[in-house]
Each structure stands twice: as C-alpha cells, then as structure tokens.
Amino acid sequence: MKIRKGDTVIVISGPDKGAKGKVIEAYPKRDKVLVEGVNRIKKHVANSAPERGAESGGIVTQEAPIHVSNVMVIDSDGNPTRIGYRFEDGKKIRVSKRNGKDI
C-alpha cells in the first residue's frame, strides 16, 4: 500500500468527496486508511468500555476507515497525485507521478 500514516490526502469519491485530511492510521492488510475529519460515524458506547474519545458511555462521533482507492495523496504543490518509487543508494523513495518530486 502506497499511502502511509502522516500523508495528507484528498477524498476522490464517496459522500466526503473533496475533503482533505491527514492519515491517522493505515491498515495495509485491509487496504484501508483512517483520515482525520473524514467518514465520521456515530458509535454507541457502553459505560464500561473505554473507547477512543469517550470518557464515559453515550454516543461518540469518530472517524471510520475508508478504502485507499477512494483517496489520493497530495504532493508538495498541493495537487492530488499517484505515487511511484525510485531506488536511491539502495533505499526505496516515494515519488510523485505528477511532478517527479519526492514525497
């Protein structure tokens, strides 16, 4: 999976199309990413279950994972781009397909 934690991405399809956010977490085995402020859901939490963002029980709004095919990485110019790879000194470097710069 070419998208990593910390990347800034834009949603290219779905109800949140056009939204930008930072990748909070990546799930490579499921091909999904968790993007800050995108695909927010309401989750009902019991009093005893400590969840992310919940002090006690009730209804919690949090981000849900979104498939990687629905997002694109934003390059240094601020445009959405695909990602390629280049090998330099035996290291794999991610490169923007749009302008050829390192990501």
Swiss-Prot record:
CDD domains with a match to the protein in the record: KOW_RPL26 (cd06089)
GO CC, alphabetical: ribonucleoprotein complex; ribosome
Gene3D superfamilies assigned: 2.30.30.30
Pfam families cross-referenced by the UniProt entry: KOW (PF00467), ribosomal_L24 (PF17136)
Keyword rRNA-binding listed: yes
SUPFAM superfamilies, per database record: Translation proteins SH3-like domain (SSF50104)
Keyword Oxidoreductase carried by entry: no
An individual GO BP term: translation
SMART domains: KOW (SM00739)
InterPro entries cross-referenced by the UniProt entry: KOW (IPR005824), Rib_uL2_dom2 (IPR014722), Ribosomal_uL24 (IPR003256), Ribosomal_uL24_CS (IPR005825), Ribosomal_uL24_KOW (IPR041988), Translation_prot_SH3-like_sf (IPR008991)
Keywords, in A-Z order: Ribonucleoprotein, Ribosomal protein, RNA-binding, rRNA-binding
General function of this protein: One of two assembly initiator proteins, it binds directly to the 5'-end of the 23S rRNA, where it nucleates assembly of the 50S subunit. One of the proteins that surrounds the polypeptide exit tunnel on the outside of the subunit.
Family to which the UniProt record says this protein belongs: Belongs to the universal ribosomal protein uL24 family.
Name listed for the protein in its UniProt record: Large ribosomal subunit protein uL24
Originating organism: Corynebacterium urealyticum (strain ATCC 43042 / DSM 7109)
Gene: rplX
